[in-house]
Amino acid sequence: WIMGHMVNAIAQIDEFVNLGANSIETDVSFDSSANPEYTYHGVPCDCGRTCTKWEHFNEFLKGLRKATTPGDSKYHEKLVLVVFDLKTGSLYDNQASDAGKKLAKSLLQNYWNNGNNGGRAYIVLSIPNLAHYKLITGFKEALTSEGHPELMDKVGYDFSGNDDIGDVANAYKKAGVTGHVWQSDGITNCLLRGLDRVRKAVANRDSSSGYINKVYYWTVDKRQSTRDALDAGVDGIMTNYPDVIADVLNESAYKAKFRIASYDDNPWETFKN
């Protein structure tokens, strides 16, 4: 999965997919009542990027729905996964469940079109704080009470705080999550980060007792760091330059081993060689 980083304006969906992304990451900010409000990152952000592009969250969802609904004039067949980077740092811990419920209702209405031929992309809820695990239970409760528990088949999870892998496993246990787990590791492109924790995550993914299904590394903009991440065995790379990742995947060393994921590749299944 080539994951376009910080795609917060509707116009950027086309831009990143046209550069080679089959997945995008979108920032979601919340108001003081735990309603998802804007797709917005703000300052500071990655080096070389404009930090202030934004849409109202529900409007972004409508644009995203068009981009992922077969038959729509804006449809992109290869856009198959969306990571919502949930900026829950503005919320109190006891608002996490409400945030999950409100997020689910927004998605149900504006992205899934109330279960009637909505967008088809798989969705990852990426949460920065382990203490906010109830966002997951709230999300699930809302979809169930709205009569669409089947949409949970399209939803996966990530805790993005670079926490100890054992602590992450514990948070999932509390949330009742037993699958659909992506594990991120990374740092802003302005700084360097080694691959030690990525290797631990990959080892967990590949062990019979692990909880992780997929591992992604962020934010990678250079060819050599792309090669290093691929050599470590990641499933996804988040980038500001999807074309760079696509170029490296075309190199002879990687062409035989990796390919770009399509809609038929289940993002919740651990890949077995």
From Swiss-Prot:
Disulfide bonds join C45-C51, C47-C190. Keywords: Cytolysis, Dermonecrotic toxin, Disulfide bond, Glycoprotein, Hemolysis, Lipid degradation, Lipid metabolism, Lyase, Magnesium, Metal-binding, Secreted, Toxin. InterPro entries: PLC-like_Pdiesterase_TIM-brl (IPR017946). Mg(2+) binds at E25, D27, D85. It is found in: Secreted. One of its GO terms (cellular component) is extracellular region. It catalyses: an N-(acyl)-sphingosylphosphocholine = an N-(acyl)-sphingosyl-1,3-cyclic phosphate + choline; an N-(acyl)-sphingosylphosphoethanolamine = an N-(acyl)-sphingosyl-1,3-cyclic phosphate + ethanolamine; a 1-acyl-sn-glycero-3-phosphocholine = a 1-acyl-sn-glycero-2,3-cyclic phosphate + choline; a 1-acyl-sn-glycero-3-phosphoethanolamine = a 1-acyl-sn-glycero-2,3-cyclic phosphate + ethanolamine. Binds 1 Mg(2+) ion per subunit. GO terms for biological process: killing of cells of another organism; lipid catabolic process. GO terms for molecular function: lyase activity; metal ion binding; phosphoric diester hydrolase activity; toxin activity. Its cofactor is Mg(2+). Glycans are attached at N250. The keyword Metal-binding applies. Its EC number is 4.6.1.-. The active site is at H5, H41. Expressed by the venom gland. It comes from the Eukaryota. Belongs to the arthropod phospholipase D family. Class II subfamily. Dermonecrotic toxins cleave the phosphodiester linkage between the phosphate and headgroup of certain phospholipids (sphingolipid and lysolipid substrates), forming an alcohol (often choline) and a cyclic phosphate. This toxin acts on sphingomyelin (SM). It may also act on ceramide phosphoethanolamine (CPE), lysophosphatidylcholine (LPC) and lysophosphatidylethanolamine (LPE), but not on lysophosphatidylserine (LPS), and lysophosphatidylglycerol (LPG). It acts by transphosphatidylation, releasing exclusively cyclic phosphate products as second products. This is Dermonecrotic toxin LapSicTox-alphaIB1aiv. It comes from Loxosceles apachea.
